[in-house]
Structure formats: C-alpha cells, structure tokens
Amino acid sequence: MEQTFIMIKPDGVQRGLIGEVICRFEKKGFTLKGLKLISVERSFAEKHYEDLSSKSFFSGLVDYIVSGPVVAMIWEGKNVVLTGRKIIGATNPAASEPGTIRGDFAIDIGRNVIHGSDSVESARKEIALWFPDGPVNWQSSVHPWVYET
C-alpha cells in the first residue's frame, strides 16, 4: 500500500490545527502509520529541503521550519500521495480551493500550515529521513470498510 509523508509546520502546530489535519486524513480513510512531535534542528531542515537550496527563499524556509515544533506523520492508503496533495491544497494558499487544508486555514505562502510529499519517490525519501526505524506495522480494522477486496 502506498505511503506519504505529511508534516504540520510550526504555524499549524501553534494554531492548534493538529487534530483538524489528522481528522481530515482519517475521515478520508487513510491509516496513520507514524506520528511524532519534533523540534527540528537546522541541519535536518536543510537536508529535508535540500532540493530547494538554490532558491532565494531557502534560508527563510529553514528559519520558519526550525522556529517551533512540527508534527511529522506517515499516512498509508490507495493513491495517498496524490489524494493527500488534494486534501492539502495548492502550495500558495491564495490558489487553494475552499475545503482544502490550505484553502481553509492559510493565507500566506510563507505560512502555509502543512507539507506533503509531491511524489511516491519523495515520500520514500522523506519517510526514510524522518522515520529511520520505519512506520508502525499495523492494519486498521476499518480497512475492509474503505477498500474493496
């Protein structure tokens, strides 16, 4: 089953949106396979966003991620990467549809509440970085109610 990495950024944590984010993924039918609240070290944030290191906003992005705790999660389910991105909304909240996390809770691109893997390959890399011991091995009892066998 496909997995994705989702991170509630410091603004989402500070604003008390952790439960709301988890609720949206659970209500969709996805299974939480890993969860931790963590204060991110600068070098770790730089590694996570290394593909953006040449961008002018990189330093500010790293400053933002280390400014407070984040919630790192692994979610599992059919097409969870693509569907997770739809639940999250566009990177720029101004372009996010109402009903998405960013459409409902974010205004500024620099404080857009949440990160989600943009591909299956990115998800694998991010999960390996944030959860080196891997996900929790369990299956939800609602699995048969979400997926056809």
Swiss-Prot record:
Subcellular location: Peroxisome; Nucleus; Cytoplasm
In-chain residues carrying the UniProt-annotated modification N-acetylmethionine: M1
Enzyme class: transferase
Keyword annotations: Acetylation, ATP-binding, Cytoplasm, Kinase, Magnesium, Metal-binding, Nucleotide metabolism, Nucleotide-binding, Nucleus, Peroxisome, Stress response, Transferase
Any one Gene Ontology molecular-function term assigned to this protein's record: ATP binding
Binding sites annotated in the UniProt record for ATP: K9, F57, R85, T91, R102, N112
Extra remark: Plants over-expressing NDK1 are more tolerant to paraquat and have increased ability to eliminate exogenous H(2)O(2).
Family: Belongs to the NDK family.
Protein name from the UniProt record: Nucleoside diphosphate kinase 1
Record organism: Arabidopsis thaliana
Primary gene name: NDK1
